[in-house]
């Protein structure tokens, strides 16, 4: 009680004191009820997750009757006790069925509205801004008509105060909670699962749920009162008595409190007028009024209007149970505020903060499980357990399931569920019997216990008798409760049977429609098969045409590509032709210049021949150096071989000899590479000079062929004289140079015998006899070819192509 008072005080303090102090003393609560839901958990670390609702205004109100306070206190008790009904498995099952039906209705209505040309978002916003659909026609027609009228009126749909739902599922969840709350406001004696059952059998029509015959549901309408008085630990609401036997049904509350058709997203407002009982005026507006005419027996229902202000902004992720508890607490707070003695001024809620911190569904379920387990522990601790008697342990084993059955009774138990009856074992050899419900008279459990006639009580002799005296009354209570549940289930079966009989004509019509639809489907299937066949033929023809068109396009693209390539080749050929013409013109000019300068070439020819001779001498010297280098290399290799053979004999000196050998090899290789590199560079240089000189000489010989032979003969003698006269500016010629010069002179003497075009390009004396492949050039004689191959020259002297094979050719002279 103190905790509840602190929650209400904190609630009023958070709202800034605009609603009043909200500190009226809460009515006494049932002390045995320890698992009540705690909505205000003062946890400062989670204060940022508060749920804030939009601002709204409450008009001036002044209570003049203490009856209002009594009604509000009774309603507070009923609402707090009904919070457990959402956790009932049967209620959860009904909730799933109602949610599925309501979602189907909303989607059907949205499809009809969307057929009129509206988008899905606009339709969803318009539906969330419409009324609660309590008209006389079906729910889908109400939604469609109200939403279309709202859309055609041109009101703004996207306002922050009108649209409070993020998706259709959230709209369905909140709508279901509103319908259940509205039914329970009109019928305060109904529990949550009973209100759900009424909505289910009435196709979610709130008016029909109000008008359902009370005789059909009288067994379940006062289950909360009988449950709280007889079995405080049970979590379900078994039917106990009728509405007339329930002294706690708040009848005056239904006459004094106003209920209006609520818009989606709104909680119903409480009474905003003075209490009709206090002022003496006849209540002109009731939550729901049912009048029975004597002659016609008709019933009329009317609902008052409600304010269009939004009281709550639905928050994503909040369960239906939490939304119902929020609504109940808001009603309690407003009733307390209205019941104050002084006047109530107009105020605005800065933020309707319900919980100090947001609790997830897992936290709520775990808290409830802890409360339920504490209740079970309390019940079990009241029963003394025997520790020494074997018969007592057998009784305890048979009695403990009875407690579990009591703590976990489902909303609609199965027919084969065992009843919580404690059975005894006569001996250890007899099998253990399961508790069952039977129509036979119950055995007398007190037969073995002595009875004191003077005191009128049974006197237990041991702990077993004490346990029997305690468990037999509980067994009777459970049997009575089981019988109530059986009657309740039979009543529900009767209601379902009546509902099924009402739906028989509709089922027949639906079967007929199904047969017609099946015939139409077969005809449509045959037509579709023919259409598919024609379509496949057309697609095949279209594919063939498309493939042919693609091939044509590919051919066109290929021809265009070839045309562009040919254009580029033609342009390149034109450029090459112009370049060739330019080169021919330049060659012609050079020939003319050479013809003019032919007289001066005679003097230069002698100088070139002398230079050629000196270059040949240098080549011979380099060849000798190369031979010496090879000899030295052979010597080094022989030395290395000797050292290698010596290493096998002298293992102790292997490391030193290896180092020395490595050094010698490095020096020899370095020297060899240096000599080879130098010789190759010199040979290449001399060969290039020789080729250049030969080219110039051949050009001169072509110009003056007749004078060339005479000049060559004279030139041999002149060379000897020139060599003698040239001793002034040259050093002494070595013996090998003189010998090579004599050989060259002899070759020059025999030069006239070989045709110029058949001379070797290196020695210019022998006839060309070696063919290089793959270039097929024949430029060297056999001797020069051997020298060329020994020097590791792999390029053709004529075209510089790679020589893959050398062929020795012989030609017969004719």
Curated annotation (Swiss-Prot):
Region (Disordered): 1-51, 221-301, 411-441
Reaction it catalyzes: S-ubiquitinyl-[E2 ubiquitin-conjugating enzyme]-L-cysteine + [acceptor protein]-L-lysine = [E2 ubiquitin-conjugating enzyme]-L-cysteine + N(6)-ubiquitinyl-[acceptor protein]-L-lysine
Enzyme Commission no: 2.3.2.27
Example GO BP: protein ubiquitination
Enzyme class: transferase
Keywords: Coiled coil, Metal-binding, Transferase, Ubl conjugation pathway, Zinc, Zinc-finger
Compositionally biased region (Low complexity): 221-231
Cystine residue pairs: none
Bias (Polar residues) ranges: 289-301
Signal peptide limits: none
Pathway assigned to this chain's UniProt record: Protein modification; protein ubiquitination
Coiled-coil regions listed: 506-710
Zinc finger RING-type: from-to: 760-800
InterPro entries documented for this protein: PIR2-like, PIR2-like_helical, Znf_RING, Znf_RING/FYVE/PHD
Molecular function terms, GO-annotated: transferase activity; zinc ion binding
Domain of life of the source: Eukaryota
Basic and acidic residues biased stretches: 423-435
Family: Belongs to the RING-type zinc finger family.
Domain notes: The RING-type zinc finger domain mediates binding to an E2 ubiquitin-conjugating enzyme.
Name recorded for this polypeptide: Putative E3 ubiquitin-protein ligase RF298
């Amino acid at each position: 009680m103190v905790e509840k008072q602190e929650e209400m005080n904190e609630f009023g303090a958070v709202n800034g004191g605009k609603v009043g102090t909200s500190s009226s003393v809460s009515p006494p609560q049932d002390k045995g009820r320890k698992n009540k839901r705690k909505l205000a958990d003062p946890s400062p670390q989670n204060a940022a997750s508060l749920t804030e609702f939009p601002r709204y205004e409450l008009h001036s109100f002044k209570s003049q009757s203490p009856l209002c306070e009594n009604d509000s206190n009774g309603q507070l008790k009923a609402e707090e006790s009904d919070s457990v009904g959402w956790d009932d498995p049967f209620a959860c099952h009904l909730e799933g069925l109602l949610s599925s039906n309501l979602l189907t209705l909303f989607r059907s209505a949205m499809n009809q509205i969307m057929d009129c040309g509206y988008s899905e978002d606009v339709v969803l916003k318009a539906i969330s801004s419409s009324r609660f659909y309590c008209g006389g026609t079906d729910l889908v027609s109400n939604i469609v008509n109200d939403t279309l009228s709202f859309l055609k009126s041109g009101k703004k749909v996207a306002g922050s105060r009108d649209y409070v739902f993020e998706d259709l599922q959230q709209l369905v969840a909140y709508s279901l909670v509103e319908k259940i709350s509205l039914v329970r406001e009109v019928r305060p004696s109904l529990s949550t699962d009973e209100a759900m059952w009424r909505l289910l059998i009435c196709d979610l029509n709130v008016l029909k749920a109000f008008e359902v015959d009370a005789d059909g549901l009288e067994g379940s309408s006062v289950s909360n009162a009988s449950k709280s008085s007889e079995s405080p630990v049970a979590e379900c609401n078994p039917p106990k008595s009728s509405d007339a036997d329930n002294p706690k049904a708040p009848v005056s509350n239904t006459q004094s409190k106003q209920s209006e058709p609520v818009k989606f997203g709104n909680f119903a407002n409480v009474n905003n007028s003075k209490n009709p009982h206090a002022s003496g005026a006849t209540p002109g507006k009731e939550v729901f009024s049912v009048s029975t005419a004597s002659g016609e027996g008709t019933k009329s229902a009317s609902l008052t209007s409600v304010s269009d202000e939004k009281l709550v902004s639905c928050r994503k992720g909040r369960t239906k149970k939490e939304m119902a508890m929020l609504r109940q607490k808001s009603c309690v707070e407003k009733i307390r505020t209205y019941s104050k003695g002084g006047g109530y001024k107009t105020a605005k809620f800065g933020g309707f903060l319900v919980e100090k911190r947001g609790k997830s569904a897992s936290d709520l379920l775990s808290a409830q499980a802890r409360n339920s387990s504490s209740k079970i522990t309390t019940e079990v601790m009241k029963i003394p357990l025997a520790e020494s008697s074997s018969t007592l342990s057998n009784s305890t084993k048979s009695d403990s399931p009875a407690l579990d059955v009591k703590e976990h009774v489902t909303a609609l138990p199965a027919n084969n569920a065992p009843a919580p009856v404690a059975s005894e074992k006569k001996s250890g050899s007899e099998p253990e019997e399961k508790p069952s419900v039977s129509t036979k008279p119950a055995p007398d459990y007190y037969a073995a216990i002595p009875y004191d006639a003077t005191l009128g009580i049974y006197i237990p002799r041991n702990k077993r008798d004490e346990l029997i005296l305690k468990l037999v009354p509980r067994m009777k209570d459970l049997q009575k409760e089981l019988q109530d549940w059986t009657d309740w289930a039979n009543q529900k079966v009767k209601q379902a049977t009546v509902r099924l009989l009402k739906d028989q004509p509709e089922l027949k019509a639906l079967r007929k429609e199904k047969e017609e639809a099946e015939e139409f489907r077969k005809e449509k299937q045959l037509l579709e098969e023919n259409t598919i066949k024609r379509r496949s033929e057309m697609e095949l023809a279209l594919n063939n045409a498309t493939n042919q068109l693609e091939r044509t396009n590919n051919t066109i693209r290929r021809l265009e590509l070839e045309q562009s390539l040919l254009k580029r080749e033609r342009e390149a050929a034109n450029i090459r032709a112009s370049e060739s013409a330019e080169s021919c013109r330049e060659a012609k000019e050079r020939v003319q210049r050479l013809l003019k300068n032919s007289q001066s070439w005679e003097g230069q020819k002698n100088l070139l021949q002398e230079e050629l001779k000196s270059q040949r001498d240098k080549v011979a010297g380099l060849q000798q150096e190369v031979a010496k280098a090879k000899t030295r290399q052979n010597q080094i290799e022989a030395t290395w071989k000797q050292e290698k053979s010596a290493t096998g004999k002298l293992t102790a000196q292997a490391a030193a000899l290896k180092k020395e050998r490595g050094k010698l090899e490095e020096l020899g290789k370095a020297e060899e590479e240096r000599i080879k590199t130098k010789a190759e560079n010199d040979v290449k240089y001399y060969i290039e000079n020789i080729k250049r000189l030969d080219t110039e000489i051949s050009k001169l010989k072509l110009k003056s062929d007749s004078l060339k032979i005479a000049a060559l003969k004279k030139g041999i003698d002149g060379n000897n004289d020139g060599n003698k006269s040239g001793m002034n500016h040259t050093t002494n010629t070595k013996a090998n140079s003189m010998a090579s010069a004599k050989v060259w002179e002899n070759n020059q003497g025999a030069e006239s015998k070989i045709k110029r075009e058949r001379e070797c390009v290196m020695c210019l004396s022998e006839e060309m006899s070696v063919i290089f492949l793959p270039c097929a050039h024949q430029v060297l004689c056999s001797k020069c070819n051997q020298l060329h191959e020994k020097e590791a020259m792999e390029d053709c002297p004529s075209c510089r192509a790679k020589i893959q094979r050398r062929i020795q050719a012989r030609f017969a002279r004719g």
